[in-house]
């Protein structure tokens, strides 16, 4: 990338940026330490720990607005048993949210519901004591599955801020085995069919992520029944017209107090019900050369090149 001489904002003293694809965190750590690169993204906790002692490296830690979630299709044709509302409640109760945060790394949060921590109207985080295996087993029995069931989960080869979705899926599989649900994980490349199936609403059970297009809670309204993401889970507005109506209420609210109230109502409605379980609000870790200034985490585009200067 080369500097635009006609850029309307404040100019930096950097004329060219070279972007390199280095999927391996250890490779990034080594090339940053030796000065071959100046900024590294999507680092693991282990590589961050090693870089912490490097005198020529500075680390920026934070929490993004990107979320990882479990999706259970409401259409029984695709979701099978996970389309059952009581099964969905059981799965919520069975997940080990603190264990998921350990996999994702330092800075990970578990949002209370569908609105990320840090957004207007957010109700904060889901308490760790929400997990209850005995309650989950009872809910599963009430749903007609006292002995559990087998279910397929299709997961893509993507990652969320360096966290492999397959790793999150494996954790979900392990957690659900505690209540008798046997998950068979199949990995499919995004370009090889997963992407189309996800968008078309034909995936039955999956773990996916969602990044915000703009920093406002309205971006999360697409998870409501009838919304863009809601329909990917086979969740139509007709299935829950009261909750679906809150979409427009939130979009049209001009008073902050009224808007906050609608957003809180949405979160409460989706706290224990619905086809989506937000399992993690992703952390972000950026390591950069100490010769740079202005390197920081930005929700919408990870890093803002227009803020970076060489000291």
Regions found by a protein language model. Name each.
Residues 28-29, 37, 47-48, 78, ...:
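Short, hydrophobic alpha-helical packing/hinge segments within bilobed ligand-binding/sensory domains
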Residues 3, 68, 92-122, 164-173, ...:
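Detector for C-terminal structural segments
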Residues 43-54, 212-216:
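A ligand-binding cleft/hinge motif common to bilobed small-molecule-binding domains
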Residues 4-50:
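Ligand-site clamp/hinge motif
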Residues 11-15, 85, 133-152:
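Immediate post-signal peptide segment of exported/extracytoplasmic ligand-binding proteins
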Residues 2-7, 64-90, 94, 238, ...:
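A bilobed periplasmic-binding-protein/Venus flytrap-type ligand-binding module shared by bacterial periplasmic
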Residues 141-212, 284:
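Ligand/substrate-recognition segments at binding pockets and active sites
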């Amino acid at each position: 990338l080369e500097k635009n001489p006609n850029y309307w904002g404040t100019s930096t003293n950097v004329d060219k940026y070279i972007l390199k694809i280095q999927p391996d965190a250890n490779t990034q750590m080594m090339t940053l330490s030796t000065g071959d690169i100046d900024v590294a993204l999507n680092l693991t906790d282990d590589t961050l720990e090693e870089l912490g002692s490097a005198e020529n490296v500075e680390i920026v830690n934070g929490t993004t607005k990107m979320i990882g979630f479990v999706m259970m299709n409401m259409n029984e044709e695709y979701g099978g048993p996970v389309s059952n509302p009581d099964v969905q409640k059981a799965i919520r109760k069975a997940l080990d949210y603190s264990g998921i945060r350990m996999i994702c790394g330092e800075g990970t949060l578990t949002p209370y519901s569908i609105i990320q921590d840090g957004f207007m109207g957010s109700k904060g985080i889901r308490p760790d004591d929400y997990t209850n295996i005995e309650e989950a087993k009872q809910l599963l029995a009430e749903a007609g599955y006292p002995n559990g069931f087998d279910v397929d989960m299709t997961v893509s080869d993507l990652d969320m801020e360096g966290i492999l979705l397959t790793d999150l899926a494996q954790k979900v599989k392990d957690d659900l085995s505690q209540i008798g649900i046997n998950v068979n994980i199949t990995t499919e490349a995004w370009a090889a069919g997963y992407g189309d199936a996800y968008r078309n609403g034909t995936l039955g059970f999956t773990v996916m992520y969602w990044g915000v297009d703009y920093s406002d809670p309205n971006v999360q309204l697409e998870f409501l029944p009838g919304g863009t993401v809601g329909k990917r889970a086979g969740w139509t507005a007709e299935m829950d017209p009261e909750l679906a109506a809150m979409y427009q209420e939130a979009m049209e609210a001009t008073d902050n107090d009224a808007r906050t109230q609608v957003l809180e109502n949405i979160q409460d409605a989706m706290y224990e019900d619905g086809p989506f379980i937000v399992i993690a609000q992703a952390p972000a870790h950026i390591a950069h050369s100490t010769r740079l200034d202005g390197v920081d985490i930005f929700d919408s585009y990870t890093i803002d090149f227009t803020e970076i200067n060489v000291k």
